[in-house]
């Protein structure tokens, strides 16, 4: 909760003293006897119809407030524009007792050359307060704030150190400047600690530096490349409608092109689709296929820190087994206790038991039971091709083995002869025991 004490209208008869900004005008004996704040405009008292009038006040009432008035009068003569503390004055009224106690903690902490009251202006005499009181009066430079043990004053506002710190409005009699100034650059967000507003705006940033976090993300345009029906002998045209989000594109595809349950022809008409107009047996298969073109992946991994997303729910189900450790597919070969997370891995493993080697090298015709073993083998050919000639660098594309090329060459080099010996040893695998290190077990 925040206490906001504003320098507004004065109510001397109600026991509330004046706390407005110091103003330079003469103070008559009538005002001093009445106990009015010397910094209050005379029109304020008339506007509130304060009674009794000054000529009806008794001498006892006038003497009760005389010490307070004299205190203000002395301050005007010595420190114009500043309000001193109530030191040395007796407790002549309830008002003096309340507000002198509150003021004592602040007045004692200030220097003797520049004493300040509760709501006095803080600055050299004759210099107005800095402008910039447009929206947030608390967003000002730190040099204009005054701290103390009980609280601090910011630009004519008393700020008590309570929970939920918020600054109130500025002096109601101050003119509001039109342009924004650089006070937003030195925003004192550290005063909002109790509101969990953990903003750390540096004082050296330019005006509106914190608005960089409010930038809108760059819009990406997703276009529909679905081929629309056209009359005979006319080329088909694409839809070419653009959308700002994937959700809008998918909704458009579902409603306009894929169709509802009444649609019986499940064909993908996306531009340059490799299926070539081949129909799907079910609508959900067409929907899954369209995600290949649109790039939609609506199934994210729920495990924290993973961040992977998938286009099909089946792939997500298989992926989650890597987190859970589940392996429901057991090897069907008797005596083998290997288990796998998906059926495709189990199928690849079964080639070990059946002696099937469907993965054949196109360079040396060597076969393997698992594609990973073939990939390891192809690295040998790639290294040999880089040493001998660039023609044999790609084993998948070369039709002639490097051994035959090196054997038929008229001027073989040392590298080609070494390649010839290596490949001859690989062709004589029938005479040597099989290399079990390359098997996928």
UniProtKB/Swiss-Prot annotation:
Keyword Transmembrane helix annotated: no
GO molecular function, one term: DNA-binding transcription factor activity
GO biological process terms, semicolon-separated: determination of left/right symmetry; embryonic axis specification; nervous system development; neural crest cell fate commitment; positive regulation of DNA-templated transcription; positive regulation of transcription by RNA polymerase II
InterPro entries in alphabetical order: GLI-like, Znf-C2H2_ZIC1-5/GLI1-3-like, Znf_C2H2_sf, Znf_C2H2_type, Znf_ZIC
Low complexity compositional bias, start-end: 383-399
UniProt xrefs under PROSITE patterns: ZINC_FINGER_C2H2_1, ZINC_FINGER_C2H2_2
Polar residues bias locations: 406-429
Zinc finger (C2H2-type): 222-257, 266-293, 299-323, 329-353, 359-381
Pfam families: zf-C2H2 (PF00096), zf-C2H2_15 (PF23561), zf_ZIC (PF18366)
Location(s) in or outside the cell: Nucleus; Cytoplasm
GO CC, alphabetical: cytoplasm; nucleus
Major localisation: nucleus
Keyword Oxidoreductase: no
Ranges for region Disordered: 375-441
Gene3D superfamilies xrefs: Classic Zinc Finger
UniProt keywords, alphabetically: Activator, Cytoplasm, Developmental protein, Differentiation, DNA-binding, Metal-binding, Neurogenesis, Nucleus, Repeat, Transcription, Transcription regulation, Zinc, Zinc-finger
Domain statement: The C2H2-type 3, 4 and 5 zinc finger domains are necessary for transcription activation. The zinc fingers and the N-terminus are independently important for establishing the L/R axis.
Family classification: Belongs to the GLI C2H2-type zinc-finger protein family.
Function: Probably acts as a transcriptional activator. May bind to the minimal GLI-consensus sequence 5'-GGGTGGTC-3'. Can determine the ectodermal cell fate and promote the earliest step of neural and neural crest development. Involved in establishing left-right asymmetry in the embryo.
Protein name: Zinc finger protein ZIC 3
Organism: Xenopus tropicalis
């Amino acid at each position: 909760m925040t206490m906001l004490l504003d320098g507004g209208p004065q109510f001397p008869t109600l026991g509330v003293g004046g706390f407005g900004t110091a103003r330079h005008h003469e103070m008559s004996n009538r005002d001093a006897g009445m106990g009015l704040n010397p910094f209050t405009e005379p029109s304020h008292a008339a506007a509130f119809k304060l009674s009794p009038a000054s000529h009806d006040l008794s001498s006892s009432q006038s003497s009760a407030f005389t010490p307070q008035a004299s205190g203000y009068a002395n301050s005007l003569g010595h420190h114009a524009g500043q309000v001193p503390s109530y030191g040395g004055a007796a407790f002549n009224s309830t008002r003096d007792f309340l507000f002198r106690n509150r003021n004592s903690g602040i007045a004692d902490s200030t220097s003797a050359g520049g004493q300040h009251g509760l709501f006095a202006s803080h600055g050299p005499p004759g210099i107005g307060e800095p402008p910039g009181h447009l929206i947030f009066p608390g967003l000002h430079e730190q040099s204009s704030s005054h701290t103390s043990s009980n609280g601090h004053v910011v630009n004519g506002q008393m700020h008590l150190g309570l929970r939920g710190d918020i600054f109130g409005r500025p002096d109601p009699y101050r003119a509001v400047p039109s342009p924004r100034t650089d006070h937003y650059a030195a925003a004192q967000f550290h005063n909002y600690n109790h509101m969990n507003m953990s903003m750390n705006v540096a004082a050296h940033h330019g005006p509106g530096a914190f608005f960089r976090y409010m930038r809108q993300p760059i819009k990406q345009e997703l276009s529909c490349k679905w081929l629309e029906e056209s009359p005979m002998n006319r080329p088909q045209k694409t839809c070419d409608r653009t959308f700002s989000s994937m959700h809008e594109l998918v909704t458009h595809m579902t409603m306009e092109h894929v169709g509802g349950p009444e649609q019986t022809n499940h064909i993908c008409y996306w531009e340059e689709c490799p299926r070539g107009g081949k129909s799907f047996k079910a609508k959900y298969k067409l929907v899954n296929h369209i995600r290949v073109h649109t790039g939609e992946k609506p199934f994210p991994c729920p495990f924290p820190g993973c961040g992977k997303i998938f286009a099909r729910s089946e792939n997500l189900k298989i992926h989650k087994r890597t987190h859970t450790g589940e392996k429901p597919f057991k090897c069907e070969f008797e005596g083998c206790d290997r288990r796998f997370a998906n059926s495709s891995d189990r199928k690849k493993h079964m080639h070990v038991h059946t002696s099937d080697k469907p993965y054949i090298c196109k360079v040396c015709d060597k076969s393997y039971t698992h594609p990973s073993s073939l990939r390891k083998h192809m690295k040998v050919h790639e290294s040999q091709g880089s040493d001998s000639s660039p023609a044999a660098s790609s084993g998948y594309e070369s039709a002639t083995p490097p051994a035959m090329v090196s054997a038929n060459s008229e001027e073989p080099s040392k590298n080609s002869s070494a390649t010839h010996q290596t490949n001859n040893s690989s062709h004589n695998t029938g005479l040597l025991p099989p290399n079990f290190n390359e098997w996928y077990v």
